Every structure is written in C-alpha cells, then in structure tokens.
Amino acid sequence: MELKDYYAIMGVKPTDDLKTIKTAYRRLARKYHPDVSKEPDAEARFKEVAEAWEVLSDEQRRAEYDQMWQHRNDPQFNRQFHHGDGQSFNAEDFDDIFSSIFGQHARQSRQRPAARGHDIEIEVAVFLEETLTEHKRTISYNLPVYNAFGMIEQEIPKTLNVKIPAGVGNGQRIRLKGQGTPGENGGPNGDLWLVIHIAPHPLFDIVGQDLEIVVPVSPWEAALGTKVTVPTLKESILLTIPPGSQAGQRLRVKGKGLVSKKQTGDLYAVLKIVMPPKPDENTAALWQQLADAQSSFDPRKDWGKA
C-alpha cells in the first residue's frame, strides 16, 4: 500500500491550520463534486479529497497521520505498512495500521469521544392575543442528518406538539431539550430552540410591556370631550376623552398591555384629530363663527421657541 500525501491532495501545507484546510476542502469538494464537475476523474478526485479531509479535520487522526508520515521511510514502518500489492492506504485502514506500528494503546486512545448533537433554531410566529395565555402549537421542522465530513446528508421532517407559555416576548428563545440532531458515539442530542416572533398587529404597537393604539377623534370631540369605544387585546372598553384634548395626547389605560411573569403593561391611547371633509357653505359658516369667537388664539405663538 502507498501512504498518500493528504496535504498535497488538499493543496495545503502541514503547518496550515484547520480553517485553511477546511477552506481548501470546500473549494475542492465543490470543484470535483460528481453532480457538477465535468472533469473525467471527478468522482475519484472527490473521494480522495473527502478521504484526506476525514483524517486532517480530526485533530487526533491528523497527529497520528503526521507521525506515520514522519516514519514512512523507517524499516519497521515499511515492514508493517507495505505489502507489495500496489494498493493505496485509505482512512478506513487507520486503526489497523496505526495500532500495528505504534501499539494497541495508541489505537484505543484515538477513539473519537462522545459529541453532543447540533442545536436547531426555528422561528415561531405568535399573535399578540396569543401572548395573554398559554397555548398549544403544532410545529414542523426538518432535522438535518450529518455525514462523517460534517455536511448535511439529508433532512428528516419532524412534527412536535409544544406549549407556548403566556407572556412570551419578541425574540424570546424557548428551549426544547434533546429535540435537536442526535449526538455521536453516545453523546447527548442537541436542543431545539423556538425563537418567538410577535406578528405585526393592525391596531397595536408594542413599546416594551406597553401597547399603543391610535384613536381617531373629531375636532369637537377633542374640544368638548366624549367617550369612545376602544379595543384591547381581550375586550373593548369605554375610554373617556377629556375636554380640551390635543392631537398626539396619550391617555393611559392601566393593565391592558402585555402580560409577563413579572408585570402587566398598560395600554396608551394616542389621540389623532381627524378633520371632516371639505365643508359645504353652512359648515364653513359655522367654522367661521368659531374662528371669530377665538380670534385671539394663536396656535403658533410659541412656535420655534425653546
């Protein structure tokens, strides 16, 4: 058998770090992938690159390979390694060859340790109304299966029934232990993380734990005061608009905001004064009477002053 020069195959130096080797592997894997490459020997080159990566990507295997490469001209190495059959060494021969040259203890010491599986993140959209109480949700996601080279080989569809707790906030992460990818060599599974995304609401804006809603009122309602029906996340309430209210004024409704374990926010009604359509002759006359009665009022009196 012939001991291959994995560094030459990858186009890297023995002193290069793993990041450099990984970059080279990805470039060569794309270049020689049988599905995309037009090279006549693409499949063989792809397998050769994958074999080199399998050894050089593992710190312990790489150290053992370097030791074997260093001893490749030693008589003991040649007796144990070369059989005169013209075959080439590959990664599957590693255990037998290495242990025969350097001892059974070396073989046992290079067994890969248990490795934890990968975590998975998926985004879960939640409506504002759903944040008030715990609710059940069926979620579907794809569970990736990795090959020996750390590449996704396939994706397995998976469905779970989960509970979304009350009071979740935008960007909050919920951990589902052990629902990620399987561990290796007896290692624990990774976790599934649900990342909460609060869906935009047509009426409410979120400000911390509080909610804001724009309430349209007429000029006379703002001037004289009135009561208007305003929706909340649970039910509608009757909101008092005090006389002399201004555009942009915020009226607080206590305890009608978002709910969490620590506190309940408030709802703020932001007044928006809406003018009626272009007035007819009679309406214009009424507006003129109002203007005459308030002739001393200058809305721009303090405009631009600090």
From Swiss-Prot:
Q: Where are the transmembrane segments?
A: none
The main location class comes to cytoplasm
- List the molecular function annotations (GO) for this entry: bent DNA binding; unfolded protein binding
Q: Which organism is it from?
A: Shigella flexneri
Extract the InterPro entries matched here. DNA-bd_curved-DNA (IPR023859), DnaJ_C (IPR002939), DnaJ_domain (IPR001623), DnaJ_domain_CS (IPR018253), HSP40/DnaJ_pept-bd (IPR008971), J_dom_sf (IPR036869)
Q: Name one GO biological process term.
A: chaperone cofactor-dependent protein refolding
Tell me any Pfam family this protein matches.
DnaJ_C
Q: Which GO terms describe its cellular component?
A: cytoplasm; nucleoid
Top-rank taxon, per record: Bacteria
Cellular location of this protein? Cytoplasm, Nucleoid
Q: What does this protein do?
A: DNA-binding protein that preferentially recognizes a curved DNA sequence. It is probably a functional analog of DnaJ; displays overlapping activities with DnaJ, but functions under different conditions, probably acting as a molecular chaperone in an adaptive response to environmental stresses other than heat shock. Lacks autonomous chaperone activity; binds native substrates and targets them for recognition by DnaK. Its activity is inhibited by the binding of CbpM.
| Ranges of residues in domain J | 5-69
Keywords associated with the record: Chaperone, Cytoplasm, DNA-binding
UniProt protein name: Curved DNA-binding protein
